[in-house]
């Protein structure tokens, strides 16, 4: 059994957790949303300063909540890519310092790999191979999970990520930031069939459309034109109906691609990860389609859909069990493909 203290500071949450394989011993998340709301989005410099102010307290709280001391911690981990460079540096520097002071193995973890492992925290039976649908503010991808650190990207968005589209539509509807939760809540009061919005498709060079790639920029533009036309006609914009129609279109698009991909590759399990995994419309669509096609669809608990350190610790524990650790010279990267995750590690000596 491996006990890992993990740190996640890739964006606007300062998170520290202690994980014993797939069991969460403690999980501390300090959100910066109230700080960034006044700006309408995350300000990188502000995020970094907030992480600096809260990281030490979060580490102490994680140890206290787990009722553990440093002698009971087997390894230290932190997100190192992708993300905001300044924010990542805060967590990575803290983790490497702790690893040196306490003479513990250190592991850098890919943020998206963490989101894949979020489902492991509640599903003890989940093991590769399976299909992962990663949907967040910065990424939308279909990943063939073959083994720990062994991934193949089968599909992705060609423009806006799903979560990014939610934020942009929320902004044009004047709903505030972050957009995902507020649109989801408002959609409960609206009619998802009120407006026929276009489902973005990605054309293939030889004709036809890509079965797994998605596009959301056209959908976002369609919502903008719809709102502009309603206002031009002097009509009140039915915000709940627009939100519901938009959410349904996104959920239908993601579901169609995930199901097709799983069936084509003979995978009977789809695990969802990322902040948009909390969306009720996506959950409803995927669960219904999974039953129809005799597939298993798994979602993380809501508290582990958004950024957290428990998922980072779970990924680190699995890597450590495979003999992987990271050099203390490891740096941060704003962009790093999930398929390159093994560059973060070297074999245990």
UniProtKB/Swiss-Prot annotation:
GO cellular component, one term: cytoplasm
Transmembrane region(s): none
Cofactor comment: Binds 1 Fe(2+) ion per subunit.
Residues reported in the UniProt entry to bind Fe cation: 111, 115, 307
Subcellular location: Cytoplasm
Keywords of this entry: Acyltransferase, Cytoplasm, Iron, Metal-binding, Transferase, tRNA processing
Cofactor: Fe(2+)
Domain of life per record: Bacteria
MF terms (GO), sorted A to Z: iron ion binding; N(6)-L-threonylcarbamoyladenine synthase activity
Cross-referenced Pfam families: TsaD (PF00814)
GO BP: any one term: tRNA threonylcarbamoyladenosine modification
Cited CDD domains: ASKHA_NBD_TsaD_bac (cd24133)
Residues the entry annotates as binding substrate: 134-138, 167, 180, 184, 279
Catalytic activity field: L-threonylcarbamoyladenylate + adenosine(37) in tRNA = N(6)-L-threonylcarbamoyladenosine(37) in tRNA + AMP + H(+)
Gene3D superfamilies: 3.30.420.40
Leading EC class: transferase
EC number, as in UniProt: 2.3.1.234
Family, as annotated: Belongs to the KAE1 / TsaD family.
Biological role: Required for the formation of a threonylcarbamoyl group on adenosine at position 37 (t(6)A37) in tRNAs that read codons beginning with adenine. Is involved in the transfer of the threonylcarbamoyl moiety of threonylcarbamoyl-AMP (TC-AMP) to the N6 group of A37, together with TsaE and TsaB. TsaD likely plays a direct catalytic role in this reaction.
HAMAP family: TsaD
Name by which UniProt lists this protein: tRNA N6-adenosine threonylcarbamoyltransferase
Gene that specifies this protein: tsaD
């Amino acid at each position: 059994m491996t006990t890992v203290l993990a740190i996640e500071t890739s964006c606007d949450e300062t998170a520290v957790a202690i994980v014993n394989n797939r069991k969460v011993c403690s999980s501390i998340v300090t959100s910066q949303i109230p700080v960034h709301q006044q700006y309408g989005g995350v300000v990188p410099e502000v995020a970094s300063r907030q992480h600096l102010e809260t990281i030490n307290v979060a580490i102490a709280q994680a140890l206290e909540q787990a009722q553990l001391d440093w002698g009971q911690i087997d390894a230290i981990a932190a997100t190192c890519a992708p993300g905001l460079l300044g924010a990542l540096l805060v967590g990575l520097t803290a983790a490497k310092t702790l690893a040196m002071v306490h003479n513990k193995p250190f592991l850098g973890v890919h943020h998206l790999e963490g989101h894949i492992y979020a489902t492991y925290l509640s599903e003890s039976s989940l093991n590769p191979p399976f299909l992962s649908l990663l949907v967040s503010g910065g990424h939308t991808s279909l990943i063939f999970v073959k083994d720990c650190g062994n991934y193949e990207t089968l599909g992705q968005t060609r423009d806006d990520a799903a979560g990014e589209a939610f934020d942009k539509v929320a902004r044009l509807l004047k709903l505030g930031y972050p957009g995902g939760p507020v649109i989801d809540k408002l959609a409960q009061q609206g009619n998802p069939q009120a407006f026929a919005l276009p489902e973005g498709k990605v054309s293939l060079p030889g004709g036809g459309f890509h079965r797994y790639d998605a596009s959301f920029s056209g959908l976002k533009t369609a919502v903008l034109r719809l709102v502009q036309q309603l206002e031009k006609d002097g009509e009140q914009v039915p915000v709940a109906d627009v939100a519901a129609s938009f959410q349904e279109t996104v959920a239908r698009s993601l579901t169609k691609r995930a199901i097709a991909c799983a069936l084509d590759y003979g995978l009977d399990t789809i695990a969802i990860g990322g902040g948009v995994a909390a969306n009720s419309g996506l959950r409803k669509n995927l669960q219904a389609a999974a039953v129809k096609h005799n597939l298993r669809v798994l979602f993380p608990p809501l508290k582990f859909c958004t950024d957290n350190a428990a998922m980072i610790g779970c990924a680190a524990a699995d890597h450590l069990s495979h003999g992987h650790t990271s050099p203390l010279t490891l740096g941060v990267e704003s962009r790093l493909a999930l398929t390159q995750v093994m560059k973060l590690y070297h074999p245990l000596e």
